[in-house]
Amino acid sequence: MAVIGATGYVGAALTEALARSAQWDVVPVGRTDHETHRTAGRYDVLINAACPSKRFWAEQHPGDDRRETVDKTRLLREHWRWDRFVQISSISARTQLDTVYGRHRAEAERMCSGAESFVVRLGPMYGGDYRKGVLADMAADRPVFASGRSRQSFAPVDWCAGWIAAHLEDTGLREVGARTTVTLAEVRDAVGSGSQFAKDFVDDQFPITATGPDWPDAAAVIDWLAGRRVSGARAS
């Protein structure tokens, strides 16, 4: 099995989850060794966790985002040898089709049809090597470019990675995140952040495919973010 984008936020967590399962011989693939591993042989499972997660960058650099998302997915499917293909995508492929980011991820998903493919749309995450996004903005009291009314299904990245590792034989499409939602305003107010929200952009991000009773509670993000704010205050 090969994980493309193994040094990224999701890719690193997924590589660790797969290694813990001891079920697979996992090959982490980054930019520097991409070609070496491409020509090394056939893989039982090829996981594409390399699509960038930079929404605002995508709007500013649509050509680059297309190359890193749509073109990369096509090249992986055509130029690597694999038996199963798992595409790590985003709920934005459904909710943000009015943006470059959402459209490109939806287009990449459409290449991944058939019984040998599985598309996982991830919702908002936290934990791990989290550095950017609405939670980082709230931790630093920066403006958040979404409405406080936005409902999101925050889930730990390690939990998401573990779920993917346990469902590699699935097919079709699944949206993965917390089983509940919390508004951005509820998170901000609970941790005492001074962030201000954009009034008109409601960015709802939560699964509409089936969730499970053992899936995370989105409100758990509050304790995580509160701890991050305390750690940041001590460091400064």
Question: Predicted regions span which residues?
Answer:
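Active-site beta-alpha turn of Rossmann-fold NAD(P)-dependent dehydrogenases/reductases
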Residues: A50, V86-S90, R121-G123, G177
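Short-chain dehydrogenase/reductase
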Residues: I4, G8, P62-R67, D98-E109, ...
